[in-house]
Every structure is written in structure tokens, then in C-alpha cells.
A protein has these predicted regions:
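Fe(II)/2-oxoglutarate oxygenase catalytic core
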Residues: 1-159, 165
Length: 166
């Protein structure tokens, strides 16, 4: 459902990024190979995603991003009825890492009460000059359209919010 803004970029100030960095550093995250919902994988490349990830479930950390997501929801004109937040997915991409084209909102209902993911966010935690690749492509049109997507390589502390069904 594409209505309102296609995406919204928020720039966190360096103090906030430092706090997020410190918080994550002190969490003792158990990084594991990233997995893609196997039900969604039928006939697809098993190397769709090559990265490490951990799930952050700490309530105050999640609430901080939930509150920002609510404000972005309003400012972007999406007007979703947001009732909660998933644990935050923290990912690390090494040399050769990737996550090919996908839709964040799968076909399966993931939450009690029938809720689905509505808003996604990617927060860039490194400056673009610290790595090669790492472009974020957001599709906003049909695959046969030109252009059909926009490419982002944002500075450290920038977050892109977008509707999960694109």
C-alpha cells in the first residue's frame, strides 16, 4: 500500500549515535548467520542474505525506536495503526555480505492478534567512506518501470524509514 511519502530520512545527532553505539556494545549480542524465512525461500537463492545478525529485545531500547517510528508514521502520512514493535534486528555485513531484493513484510502473520510489520527502518552506523558497497535500494515502482528504485548510501547516524510492504 503506497500512500504518503515513499520514505523518510531522519538524521540522529552524534550524541544519540554515541549512546546507541555504547548501548549495543554493552549488550553482549550473540551474532549468528542471518536467516531468511524458509517458507518464503521456495525456489529462491539460499544466498539471498549473507550477514550476521542479533535480535535486541531490551524494552527501553525498542521503545525509543517505537516512539520515533510513531512520529515518522504521522509525518509521512502513512497513518498506520501501530500497536507494538518487533525486537530490533541488528545486522553486520562483512566483505561479500548482501541482502538481495526482498520485501520486509512477508506473507505470513508474525504476531499475536494478526499484526504484521508495517514500517521498516535501516539505521546507518558507519560512514560511507568506511566501507565499500552497502548501498540501500528502495523499490517504489513496478519492476518494469524506469526508474523503479532509488539508491541510498547515507551518512553515519542517518535512518531511512519506509513502508514494509515495498
Amino acid at each position: 500500500m503506497k500512500y504518503g511519502d515513499y520514505y523518510r530520512i531522519i538524521d540522529f545527532n552524534q550524541d544519540v549515535i554515541k549512546k546507541i553505539d555504547n548501548k549495543i556494545s554493552n549488550m553482549n549480542l550473540q551474532m549468528k548467520d542471518s536467516l531468511v524465512n524458509k517458507e518464503e525461500l521456495k525456489g529462491l537463492d539460499p544466498n539471498l542474505r549473507i550477514s550476521k545478525q542479533a535480535w535486541i529485545k531490551e524494552k527501553s531500547f525498542c521503545k525509543y525506536f517505537f516512539d520515533i517510528g510513531q512520529k515518522v508514521n504521522e509525518l509521512s502520512g502513512w497513518n498506520f495503526d501501530i500497536k507494538g514493535i518487533e525486537p530490533i534486528q541488528y545486522g553486520i555485513y562483512s566483505d561479500g555480505g548482501k541482502y538481495d531484493w526482498h520485501v520486509d513484510q512477508g506473507s505470513k502473520i508474525l504476531f499475536k492478534g494478526g499484526s504484521v510489520r508495517k514500517i521498516s527502518m535501516t539505521l546507518f552506523m558507519n560512514n560511507p567512506d568506511e566501507y565499500e558497497g552497502g548501498e540501500f535500494d528502495l523499490e517504489y515502482s513496478h519492476p518494469e518501470s524506469k526508474p523503479r528504485y532509488k539508491t541510498f548510501k547515507l551518512k553515519k547516524g542517518s535512518a531511512i524509514f519506509f513502508q514494509s510492504d515495498v
